[in-house]
A protein has these predicted regions:
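Short helix/strand-capping connector loops at secondary-structure junctions
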Residues: 12-15, 93-98
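Generic detection of long, well-ordered alpha-helical segments
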Residues: 24-31, 83, 106, 110-113
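Elongated alpha-helical scaffolds
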Residues: 83-96
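Short helix-capping/linker segments at secondary-structure and domain boundaries
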Residues: 97-107
Length: 144
């Protein structure tokens, strides 16, 4: 999703409630805050790294680190998080801006992270099983 797409989505989520800020610096600050919340709660595949020179937010699963997402510079830039988590970012921003539906947006965002994390854990488990099977077939002497 592009930054412009995110702004359009947040605008739609706030219909009849509030509007997004006209000042793009304010919108990017809200996005930065939403990204921070997501990076601290979600096992975002796109944010997982083993490169400790990047700005790290926390430890991830296994040997992975979770890096800080980069903010977009232009409206046409793709958001630096997994596609499914873009909708979570929109909900968190809508919660920050909403006058009447704060809890609804927050709950939808939190639910999106729970569903996303469930999928990621299934993927990581499958990868570990496949690594183990590959190692057994090739006669690895290491753990994998």
């Amino acid at each position: 999703m592009t930054y412009s797409g995110l702004k359009s989505l947040v605008t739609g989520l706030l219909i009849g409630d509030n509007v997004i800020p006209k000042d793009d610096a304010v919108m990017k600050s809200l996005l930065s805050y939403a990204f921070d919340m997501i990076a601290n709660k979600a096992e975002a595949l796109r944010l997982m790294t083993i490169n400790s020179t990047e700005e790290i937010i926390r430890l991830g699963p296994g040997e992975y680190l979770v890096r800080k997402p980069n903010l977009p510079e232009l409206d046409t830039d793709e958001l630096d998080i997994d596609h499914e988590l873009c909708f979570v970012a929109a909900r968190y921003i809508a919660a920050m801006l909403s006058k009447e539906k704060i809890k609804i947006h927050q709950d939808y965002g939190d639910d999106g992270i729970l569903r996303y994390n469930g999928k990621v854990y299934q993927i990581l488990e499958k990868v570990e099983i496949e690594k183990k099977m590959l190692c057994e077939n090739e006669g690895c002497t290491n753990e994998y």
